[in-house]
Curated annotation (Swiss-Prot):
The gene is hflK. The chain crosses the membrane at residues 71-91. This is Protein HflK. InterPro entries: Band7/mec-2_domain, Band_7, Band_7/SPFH_dom_sf, HflK, Stomatin_HflK_fam. HflC and HflK may interact to form a multimeric complex. Residues 1-10 have a biased composition (Polar residues). It holds the Pfam family Band_7. PANTHER family: MODULATOR OF FTSH PROTEASE HFLK (PTHR43327:SF2), STOMATIN-LIKE PROTEIN 2, MITOCHONDRIAL (PTHR43327). Keywords: Membrane, Transmembrane, Transmembrane helix. CDD domains: SPFH_HflK. GO terms for cellular component: membrane. Belongs to the band 7/mec-2 family. HflK subfamily. Residues 15-34 have a biased composition (Basic and acidic residues).
């Protein structure tokens, strides 16, 4: 065949180094092995020779040496091998590869071993797992025209590497500017007391929403994870006054909590006491109603007897009433036959808690003499008008005793 020989003097061979059909039928020996190696060498030289002709763009193959190799061919082969090998690259687990073809975005590649055609495609690895931080601070004006210094920390993560690299030129600077703008807007709509005290949590959430709305049209390829409102303090010139105001506010809150605790402790007792008084009043009302009804029944029973004999009935009622009155009072018995003068300290006697009733009955005169005061020396005792109106019966008894004493003196 034509591809098995360089010239007519060489035997016809096949490309796999085998002999022609006549030699295949014969036995193999050492000469066959040598011929086989020679055929392989000649085939490789022919391959290099043909490639050399392509690079040199000439059809005059008779002027070149059949056994000589062009060094440019070797350089080209090595360069091609290096170019292919240099196209391999590795993307880490936390990264994503952004592939560009002649500078234009092509696609994203996953973590692992990948290959790219060098000088045609470029790959830039972007970390999409690391949480990044951006800190900002500044002196800002509040709604009540006060100045406050604010510090804030923004945590974010890259979620779209292509947008992060190609949407804007400097995404981190754009995020910083959006954060400053959002923070100043929120602080400008809040008063200073709110910024320094109870409004910090609300300011943080409002600032995060404002940042997200600001960067959304620009497609920065990032996601805001958290916004930390770190420090807010007044200027040094008025710091002491604000500290006093904050301390006063804290004291007020403490007093309110103490008052609520005291109220929670006292109110149940007061409600219980009020309920007890109401129950006692209801019981007293019921008792008085029942007693009145009993009196009505009793008088209704006495009414027929009263109609029959008025004097006897009135006398009996008088005796019963006097029995009830005198059974709970102190009494003094005087012997009319004894004409000696009797002096009693009635004030001490009637206000005395305890006394010996047996001595009073056995020797009332001696008992009365033991008192140090008399009616003549004690103006307060002799003055009946000094007693309160509620002691009506006591006045009557004192007047009765004084009348008896005067009668004895006359005799």
């Amino acid at each position: 065949m034509a591809w098995n020989k360089f010239n007519n003097s060489e035997p016809e061979l096949d490309p796999w180094g085998k002999k022609n059909s006549q030699e295949k039928n014969g036995s193999k020996n050492k000469d066959d092995r040598k011929n086989h190696e020679k055929i392989i060498t000649l085939d490789f030289k022919k391959f290099l020779y043909n490639i050399n002709n392509i690079f040199n763009k000439t059809n005059n193959s008779q002027n070149l040496s059949k056994n000589k190799i062009n060094p440019f061919l070797i350089i080209a082969f090595v360069s091609f091998f290096v170019w292919c090998f240099s196209g391999f690259y590795t993307i880490k687990e936390a990264e994503r590869g952004v592939v560009t073809t002649f500078g234009k975005f092509s696609h994203l590649v996953a973590p692992g071993l990948n290959w790219r055609p060098v000088f045609i495609n470029e790959v830039k690895a972007v970390n999409v797992e690391t949480v990044r931080e951006l800190a900002t601070s500044g002196v800002m004006l509040t709604s009540d025209e006060n100045v406050v210094r604010v510090e804030m920390n923004v945590q974010y993560k890259i979620t779209d590497p292509a947008d992060y690299l190609f949407s804007v030129a400097y995404p981190d600077d754009s995020l910083r500017q959006a954060t400053d703008s959002a923070l100043r807007g929120v602080i400008g709509h809040s008063n200073m007391d709110r910024v320094l005290t109870e409004g910090r949590t609300l300011i943080r959430s409002d600032t995060q929403k404002e940042i997200e709305e600001t960067i959304k049209p620009y497609k920065l390829g990032i996601t805001i994870l958290d916004v930390n409102f770190q420090t807010a303090r007044p200027p040094e010139e008025v710091k002491e006054a604000f500290d006093d105001a904050i301390a006063a506010r804290e004291n007020r809150e403490q007093y309110i909590r103490e008052a609520e605790a005291y109220s929670n402790e006292v109110q149940p007792k007061a409600h219980g006491k009020a309920q007890r008084i109401l129950e006692e009043a209801k019981a007293y009302s019921s008792r008085r109603i029942l007693e009145a009804q009993g009196e009505v029944v009793r008088f209704l029973k006495i009414l027929p007897e009263y109609r029959k004999n008025k004097e006897m009935t009135l006398k009996r009622l008088y005796i019963e009433s006097m029995e009830k009155l005198l059974s709970k009072t102190k009494k003094i018995f005087i012997d009319k036959k004894n004409h000696s003068k009797l002096f009693l300290s009635l004030n001490n006697f009637f206000h005395q808690d305890k006394f010996n009733k047996q001595d009073l009955f056995n020797n009332p005169i001696n008992l009365s003499k033991n008192h140090s005061c008399s009616f003549q020396k004690n103006k307060e005792i002799n003055d009946v008008s000094s007693l309160p109106p509620s002691d009506f019966f006591k006045k009557r008894r004192i007047e009765s005793i004084r009348t008896n004493i005067k009668n004895i003196e006359r005799e």
